[in-house]
């Protein structure tokens, strides 16, 4: 059973995955309802929403972003990162893909919705196979420097983060033009406070026009913005494919 925002209901959620076509080649793990903490669709009543799975030990994860009170759930089926079997399976896949593709690092998407201690131990697990210099950058989309600082502390400085506050400073500068004080362009940014952990960006796939986090830096300012992140000593600059190729 699931619980909605107002009452406990009986629901049909699509939470069973057996992967018959794999024939257990890479994994014999089968996903069941108890490997998830929530779902975004009630098939019984054909409605979308946020439905929390009920059961022993079931709850939204702690160590996630505080937006909306608790931002564990994002969409579709929310994986339960407190379940030991889930943690073990994800760690195993992390090691597998890193070895199979001979990776030097990886980007972790939407980590504000993942339990911070899961991310920390996941990187420990992968680095146990690939070495301590295995690189990781996380997309923690929050423009508040204090939130990014707190996350960095929580995961023990084990992951770099995209400098979201810097992006928003650049967006503001491109909007205000001559009225913007360029002395503030690095104010309250990750690269100012944690230059060794900041991945500096101008735009990305989520900030471009028509996307979910639309805040596209105006075209006239982009050469200046890229000149800054590519030429300054601090931070690891990241060039957006869409800006380079159009």
Region spans (language model):
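Core domains of carbohydrate- and sulfate-ester-processing enzymes
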Residues: 11-72
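Active-site-adjacent "subsite" loops/lids of carbohydrate-active enzymes
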Residues: 54-100, 111
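Short, small-residue-biased leader/transition segments that mark boundaries at the very start
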Residues: 2-9
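Active-site-proximal helices and loops of the catalytic beta/alpha 8
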Residues: 10-37, 92-246
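Short, mixed-charge, low-aromatic patches
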Residues: 45-53, 72-82, 179-186
């Amino acid at each position: 059973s699931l619980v909605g925002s107002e009452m406990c209901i009986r629901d049909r959620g699509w939470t069973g995955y057996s992967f018959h076509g794999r024939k257990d080649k890479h994994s014999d793990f089968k996903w069941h309802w108890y490997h998830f903490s929530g779902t975004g669709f009630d098939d019984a009543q054909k409605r979308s929403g946020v439905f929390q799975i009920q059961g022993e030990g079931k709850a939204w994860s702690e160590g996630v972003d505080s937006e909306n009170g608790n931002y564990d759930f994002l969409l579709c089926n929310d994986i339960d990162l407190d379940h030991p079997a889930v943690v073990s399976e994800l760690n195993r896949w992390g090691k597998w893909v890193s070895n199979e593709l001979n990776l030097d690092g990886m980007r972790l998407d939407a980590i504000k919705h993942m339990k911070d201690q899961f991310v920390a131990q996941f990187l420990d697990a992968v680095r146990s196979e690939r070495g301590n210099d295995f690189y990781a950058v996380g997309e923690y989309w929050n423009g508040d420097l204090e939130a990014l600082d707190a996350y960095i502390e929580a995961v023990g400085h084990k992951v770099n983060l995209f400098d979201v506050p810097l992006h928003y400073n650049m967006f503001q500068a491109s909007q205000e033009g001559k009225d913007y004080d360029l002395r503030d362009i690095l104010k309250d940014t990750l690269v100012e406070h944690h230059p060794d952990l900041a991945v500096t960006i101008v735009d990305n796939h989520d900030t471009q026009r028509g996307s979910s986090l639309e805040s596209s830096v105006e075209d006239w300012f982009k050469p200046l913005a890229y000149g800054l992140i590519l030429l300054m000593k601090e931070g690891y600059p990241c060039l957006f494919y869409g800006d380079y190729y159009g």
